[in-house]
Amino acid sequence: ISLIRHPNVGGILAVGLGCEYIQPEWLSNIAKEEEKESAWLFIQNEGGTRTAINKGVEEVQRILKKLKQTPRVEMGFDDLVIGAECGGSDYTSGLAGNVVVGRFFDKLVDMGGTAIFEEIVEAIGLVDLLTKRAVDQKAKEEIQYTYDKALEYCKAVRQYSVSPGNFAGGLSTIEEKSMGAVVKSGSRP
């Protein structure tokens, strides 16, 4: 639902089989309440996958046609807020992909934009790297509090956000994964 309400989403096509708890019509109605273009369909009601795909393409083309009529509004970098989400960590994450995201975040912040790094659970062992970048004492305390809360949770459930897939991808410890994740946050306050 939050994705439907996201300002960068102009319209949606909600697709279902008919047996889901969250029904596509309901999602479509939420989009309409947000004054966004929307359509929905059930694959089974359309007569199968091929027919549903064709119907979906028609609906998306209709939505795009209306979206193209939307007036463009200029904005500055100071209006831009971008967040990074985990993309699956392996041994290359801290060497390549996440480094690029971190450099992008630095440039975004330098131009007045806002970058959000939300993976505090994946920063286990590296809180000092984050707190030293805080813009003030209050921010430093908030980072420390959030980190401590995440660490307490990890200890309680005995799970430190490292998965079998991470190990299969070449990572060996949560600290190694954390280094790859934190580099994604860039280096700016």
Regions found by a protein language model. Name each.
Residues 1-189:
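Metallocofactor- and cofactor-centric catalytic cores in central/energy metabolism, strongly enriched
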